[in-house]
């Protein structure tokens, strides 16, 4: 856990330093470049950090290595991710490379998105870590790739341009098909979230909340059949504190809707995103698997909350207004105080969410493990570099076996000397016989 707080502290210090002397585009881009290097490197060098690392993505990459002719469409992974794995496997047989490539891809896309669409890249980056989106990227790799790709559809959603919006969502769905839920959202978003609509949403939410089992039973008959009602991810429930936190985040955006829409009427999109982030997190308290749909909407918070902060900050000339005692500056002083309280509330609330998320460790990122510190990995790299040395050990054992008494059957002796199959050689350390869906505990040396 200390690793992540050091990381957060470094990002906070950098954010403060880069804002000295005022913000400008060049400083924003340099800051994002440094953030990209720090976050991508930390994620790329992880080992068994994130539940899906050990029993999903590392074995999945080894499967592609062992069967390079596997079809893009003949696997339970989506074709976009399968294509990515095949491309990585073409250049490297080191399974860690899939985590290097996906880390660079995910963090790179987030930084590009913030560079293009965030009104305050510094606050966006801090919220990206505080709201556990960074830790989500270490666990739900395919869905995070889909989610960050889908973020680029928001500008087209604002402009109500369905075709480019649809194309981006379809690309996202090639990494995780759950992204297709964003297609009907386009039409839902055509209805602004007014107070009356909000009341209707609340009523519908209440009805759906107490009928989730019927809905899940119907859906899993046709889609995601592995998530039937007996599945552990369906039976398990998500903790209420996360739903409460998501409700607070929604209320922040909802109560600031007037300022957001005053700046740009199309910004009501963020209010809808905030509501559905809360909606699916709430449904996750019934069936935890439903919370995963909130990912596509949660990723918008590092855009919407900084935008609201920017709107508030534009209502006064500078932070010095807090200390200006002139009567004519009363309004500026009040606006500055409100903005300061808002920022403090967001950061303190974010820290609380961050601490609780790491304590509960839903993404399996605690403790952080670095691949370079694992002794077996050095042996793994040596075997990749010198594969011709591997058969030497069984050959040396042949001598004492040949000297056995004559009555020892030769066929049995020869079977003892057989080399492991390539599939066995390529298995991950401590990966044999791992039950599907269970995290792997790797003891530290």
Which ranges hold each PLM region?
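Membrane-interface junctions at the ends of membrane-embedded or membrane-associated helices
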Residues: 22-24, 159-164, 307-336
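Alpha-helical transmembrane segments and terminal signal-anchor/GPI-anchor hydrophobic tails
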Residues: 49, 54-58, 64-65, 186-298, ...
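Short hydrophobic/aromatic helix or loop-helix immediately within or flanking a transmembrane segment
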Residues: 54-63, 70-93
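Membrane-interface alpha helices of multi-pass inner-membrane proteins
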Residues: 133, 153, 164-188, 204, ...
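Specific aromatic-rich, kink-prone transmembrane helix
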Residues: 145-161
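Transmembrane helical bundles and short interhelical boundary loops of multi-pass, membrane-embedded
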Residues: 273, 281, 288, 328, ...
């Amino acid at each position: 856990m200390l690793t992540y707080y050091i990381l957060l502290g470094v990002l906070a210090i950098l954010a403060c330093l880069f804002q000295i002397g005022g913000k400008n585009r060049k400083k924003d881009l340099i800051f994002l470049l440094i953030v990209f290097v720090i976050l991508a490197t930390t994620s790329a060098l992880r080992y068994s950090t994130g539940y899906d690392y050990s029993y999903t993505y590392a074995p999945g990459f080894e499967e592609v290595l062992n069967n390079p002719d596997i079809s893009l469409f003949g696997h339970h992974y989506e074709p976009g991710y399968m294509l990515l794995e095949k491309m990585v496997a073409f250049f490297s047989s080191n399974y860690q490379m899939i985590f290097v490539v996906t880390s660079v891809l995910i963090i790179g896309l987030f930084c590009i998105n913030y560079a293009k669409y965030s009104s305050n890249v510094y606050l966006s980056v801090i919220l990206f870590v505080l709201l556990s989106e960074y830790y989500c990227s270490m666990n739900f790799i395919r869905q995070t790739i889909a989610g960050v790709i889908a973020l680029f559809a928001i500008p087209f959603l604002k402009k109500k341009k369905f075709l480019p919006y649809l194309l981006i969502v379809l690309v996202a769905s090639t990494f995780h098909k759950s992204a297709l839920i964003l297609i009907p959202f386009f039409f839902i978003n055509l209805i602004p979230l007014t107070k009356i609509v909000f009341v209707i949403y609340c009523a519908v939410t209440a009805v759906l909340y107490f009928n989730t089992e019927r809905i899940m039973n119907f859906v899993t008959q046709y889609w995601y059949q592995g998530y039937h009602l007996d599945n552990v991810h369906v039976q398990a429930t998500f903790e209420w504190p996360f739903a409460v936190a998501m409700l607070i985040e929604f209320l922040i955006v909802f109560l600031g809707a007037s300022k957001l829409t005053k700046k740009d009427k199309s910004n009501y999109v963020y209010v809808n995103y905030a509501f559905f982030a809360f909606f699916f997190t709430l449904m996750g308290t019934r069936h935890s698997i439903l919370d995963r749909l909130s990912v596509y909407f949660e990723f918008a918070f590092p855009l919407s909350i900084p935008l609201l902060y920017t709107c508030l900050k534009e209502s006064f000339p500078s932070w010095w207004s807090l200390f200006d005692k002139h009567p004519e500056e009363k309004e500026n002083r009040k606006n500055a105080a409100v903005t300061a309280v808002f920022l403090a509330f967001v950061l303190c609330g974010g820290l609380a969410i961050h601490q609780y998320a790491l304590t509960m460790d839903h993404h399996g990122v605690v403790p952080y493990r670095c691949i370079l510190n694992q002794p077996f990995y050095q042996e793994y790299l040596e075997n990749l570099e010198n594969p011709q040395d591997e058969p030497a050990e069984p050959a040396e054992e042949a001598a004492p076996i040949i000297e056995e008494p004559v009555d020892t059957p030769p066929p049995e002796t020869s079977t003892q000397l057989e080399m492991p199959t390539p599939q066995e050689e390529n298995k991950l350390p401590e990966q044999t016989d791992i039950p599907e869906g269970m995290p792997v505990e790797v003891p530290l040396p």
